[in-house]
């Protein structure tokens, strides 16, 4: 739906729409719709009237709570108490839908463009990642969120400075936010009027192409003066060298703009420069290190190092003698290699560090404190510790070693442009020089640790099963509690409070280290926002007459979990049941699949989508991602999805991946069913692999339309629910609400 621009609507534009129009985001608030009987089902009038009374009661109770909150707010104001939301009680019932979390970015963009002028930039790029190319970043590295207001985990912001505007105090320009299908709805809600949303894989151009086109348009407006070079700037630590080379190639070949447009490094991060003008710049976290015991990791550092060096020697050129230095950049790879964990990034047990490793030495660059036991561990294993910042000096120093005919220097394809620049300090390290270095004793490779880490050993697999059982017990207790509160007691509970309750339950489990990501607790239309997270204040009330989607996970010392269940607490519509069942059928089909070794997840993605496709439906995210072992909840390199890079990484025995098809109806509801699966040898079929569902949480019986299931699927569900019951019942008090809930949900179809 499109509408004319309005000064009262501060939402982002969509790049795919006609100039002069823009798409409005999902409404931030609306009045509850009156109950209407479903139009396409066989419900009896009695059932419908009970559902109607429950909906009406819910709305009356909500209205009473709002009225009480309003009276309390007036009392506070009258007493000079202001409008503090410290307790959240005044605001917790404010809306049935997601609140408008839009940030006004006008002043921030103005300041940024002033900084761009100092560096003679026509365009500036702000990626999501940190210098380790992390998907999830610390507050210190959330530059893209700061400048754009968009809080999703993936996306790139591009800001231009209009060179035809000569008002230095108020420079003008454009700004876009590019993100993928998981975040389209969220971006429309969070971006203000300064921003245009560029939808990856749907809009006709990429963000890189947009930057070059804008630069060329400005050059044209300035008369394409001889010798004029328009500069696109980026922090060289925040873009990989490979991406830099691809960007340069696109400028030079696709647009024939060599000498007209240039991608330049800006070592002073411009967002960091303006951040303190608006709020305190967060400090980089530097928390204590944790040394994992063998009972949790199952493989000593020396054994991992031996495997790594063998892989590196296989990748090195035949001219070297085996003394190949490799720089480990990814934080989870460092944690896995050293059997250490940290807490520098929320939900991810990692710490800021680099590692330089070869046959003779292992150097860990970190500022994180550690105890005497870890100090002794470093000494025993020959691990030298240096300050985090010294990695750049070290890279410059060992360039001379890399020039030796007997030594090859290797960096991962996740290495930053700045890393390559440090390896070649005599020049500016453009693409041509990189090729020359590569032809000598310098190479960019895919990190062998990425694959080694993804193949879990026997101890990690055993522990992963334990983690799944622990989390399943928590989720059973949580869903039983939620139903008792919302249906049994007709209480008002908002999405955020519910998520906090789930965390409280998880904290009762031994070795619980925290959540593996921010809990997605979403009711009704909020569930259609794929990566929704409830706000602390003004969170939506969970409506028991609508779908509720809960996507959550835990970090235990034993392992990492990622589980989604979609439930309905009263009477779902036939459409909701049908679409839930189509999603469920896709997940079941993928789980049953037996496939040849060396099959990439790209090749089997359609298995999970086939039943949705048959109805003209689909979902805009991958079907499965790797899961770490008390590490990142998103782990590569393999996965099941439609992204072309997944064709390069086959699924292997020992991988743990998610299985999470879904369906999302904008403005109404969302469905996702996610379980974690272990890939195993299918010995009865020769060189074939199969999946084992490790998650033991029941599906929602109310949402299953058995008429859409065949006998094989019914048997599969019944056998799964029988296993869930056998596994979990021993952890529950007999005849408790959790016990009764589990018994009902796992009863045969």
UniProtKB/Swiss-Prot annotation:
Source superkingdom: Eukaryota
InterPro entries cross-referenced by the UniProt entry: Creatin/AminoP/Spt16_N (IPR029149), Creatinase/aminopeptidase-like (IPR036005), Creatinase_N (IPR000587), Pept_M24 (IPR000994), Pept_M24B (IPR033740), Peptidase_M24_C (IPR032416), Peptidase_M24B_aminopep-P_CS (IPR001131), X-Pro_aminopeptidase_P (IPR050422)
Cofactor binding: number and manner: Binds 2 manganese ions per subunit.
Gene3D superfamilies assigned: Creatinase/methionine aminopeptidase superfamily, Creatinase/prolidase N-terminal domain
Keyword Transmembrane helix: no
Keywords: Aminopeptidase, Cytoplasm, Hydrolase, Manganese, Metal-binding, Metalloprotease, Phosphoprotein, Protease
Region described as Disordered: 1-33
Keyword S-adenosyl-L-methionine carried by entry: no
PROSITE patterns: PROLINE_PEPTIDASE
Residues carrying Phosphoserine: 69, 92, 95
CDD domains documented for this protein: APP
Major localization listed first in the record, in broad terms: cytoplasm
Single Gene Ontology BP annotation: negative regulation of transcription by RNA polymerase II
MF terms in GO: metal ion binding; metalloaminopeptidase activity
Catalytic activity: Release of any N-terminal amino acid, including proline, that is linked to proline, even from a dipeptide or tripeptide
Binding positions for Mn(2+) 1 per the UniProt entry: 562, 660, 674
Positions with a binding annotation for Mn(2+) 2: 551, 562, 674
Role of this protein: Involved in the regulation of the iron regulon in responss to decreased mitochondrial iron-sulfur cluster synthesis.
Name of the protein: Putative Xaa-Pro aminopeptidase FRA1
């Amino acid at each position: 739906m499109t509408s004319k621009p309005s000064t009262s609507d501060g939402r982002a534009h969509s790049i795919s729409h006609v100039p002069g129009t823009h798409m409005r985001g999902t409404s931030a608030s609306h009045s509850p719709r009156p109950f209407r009987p479903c139009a396409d089902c066989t419900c009896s009038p009695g059932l419908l009237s009970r559902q109607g009374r429950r909906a009406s009661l819910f709305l009356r109770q909500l209205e009473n709570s709002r009225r009480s909150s309003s009276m309390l707010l007036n009392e506070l104001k009258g007493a000079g108490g202001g409008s503090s939301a410290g307790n959240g009680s005044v605001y917790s019932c404010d809306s049935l839908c997601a609140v408008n979390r839009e940030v006004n970015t006008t002043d921030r963009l103005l300041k940024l463009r002033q900084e761009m002028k100092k560096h003679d930039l026509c365009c500036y790029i702000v990626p999501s990642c940190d210098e380790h190319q992390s998907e999830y970043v610390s507050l210190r590295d959330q530059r893209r969120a700061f400048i754009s207001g968009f809080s999703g985990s993936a996306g790139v912001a591009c800001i231009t400075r209009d060179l035809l505007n000569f008002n230095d105090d108020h420079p003008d320009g454009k700004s876009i936010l590019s993100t993928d299908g998981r975040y389209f709805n969220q971006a429309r809600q969070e971006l203000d009027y300064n921003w245009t949303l560029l939808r990856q894989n749907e809009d006709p151009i990429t963000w890189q192409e947009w930057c070059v086109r804008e630069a060329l348009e400005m050059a044209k407006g300035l008369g394409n003066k001889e010798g004029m070079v328009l500069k696109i700037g980026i922090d060289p630590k925040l873009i990989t060298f490979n991406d830099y080379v691809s960007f340069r190639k696109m400028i030079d070949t696709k647009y024939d703009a060599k000498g007209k447009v240039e991608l330049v490094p800006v070592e002073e991060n411009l967002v960091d420069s303006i951040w303190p003008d608006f709020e305190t710049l967060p400090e980089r976290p530097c928390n204590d290190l944790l040394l994992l015991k063998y009972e949790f990791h199952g493989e000593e550092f020396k054994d991992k190092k031996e495997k790594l060096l063998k892989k590196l020697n296989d990748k090195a050129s035949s001219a070297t003698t085996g003394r190949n230095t490799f720089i480990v950049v990814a934080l989870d790879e460092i944690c896995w290699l050293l059997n250490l964990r940290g807490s520098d990034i929320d939900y991810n047990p990692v710490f800021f560090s680099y590692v330089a490793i070869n046959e003779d030495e292992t150097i860990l660059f970190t500022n994180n404190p550690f105890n005497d036991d870890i100090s002794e561990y470093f000494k025993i294993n020959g691990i030298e510790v240096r300050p985090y910042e010294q990695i750049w000096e070290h890279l410059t120093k060992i360039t001379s070693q890399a020039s030796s005919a007997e030594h090859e220097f290797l960096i991962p394809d996740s290495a930053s442009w700045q890393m390559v620049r440090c390896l070649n300090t005599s020049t500016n390290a453009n693409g041509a020089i990189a090729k020359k270095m590569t032809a000598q004793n310098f190479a960019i490779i895919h990190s062998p640790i990425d694959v080694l880490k993804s193949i879990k050993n026997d101890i990690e697999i055993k522990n992963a099963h334990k983690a799944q059982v622990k989390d399943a017990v928590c989720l059973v207790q949580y869903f039983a509690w939620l139903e008792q509160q919302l249906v049994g007691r007709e209480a008002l509970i908002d999405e955020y409070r519910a998520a906090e309750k789930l965390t409280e339950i998880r904290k009762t489990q031994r070795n619980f280290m925290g959540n593996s990501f921010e809990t997605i607790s979403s009711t009704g239309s909020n569930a259609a926002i794929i990566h929704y997270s409830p706000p602390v204040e003004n969170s939506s009330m969970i409506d028991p007459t609508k779908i509720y989607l809960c996507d959550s996970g835990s970090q235990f010392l034993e392992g990492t979990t990622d589980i989604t269940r979609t439930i309905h607490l009263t009477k779902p519509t036939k459409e909701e049941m049908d679409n839930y069942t189509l999603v469920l059928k896709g997940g079941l089909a993928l789980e049953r699949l037996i496939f040849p070794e060396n099959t990439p997840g790209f090749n089997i993605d359609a298995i999970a989508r086939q039943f949705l496709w048959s109805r003209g439906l689909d979902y805009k995210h991958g079907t499965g991602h790797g899961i770490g072992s008390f590490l990142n909840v998103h782990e590569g390199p393999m996965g099941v999805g439609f992204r072309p890079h997944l064709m390069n990484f086959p699924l292997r025995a020992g991988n743990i991946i998610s299985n999470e098809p879904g369906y999302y109806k904008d403005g109404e509801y969302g469905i996702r069913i996610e379980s974690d699966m272990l890939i195993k040898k299918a010995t009865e079929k020769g060189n074939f692999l199969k999946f084992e569902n490790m998650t033991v949480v029941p599906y929602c019986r109310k949402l299953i339309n058995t008429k859409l299931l065949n006998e094989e699927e019914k048997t599969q569900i019944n056998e799964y629910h029988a296993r869930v019951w056998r596994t979990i019942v021993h952890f529950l008090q007999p005849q408790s609400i959790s016990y009764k809930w589990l018994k009902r949900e796992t009863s045969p179809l």
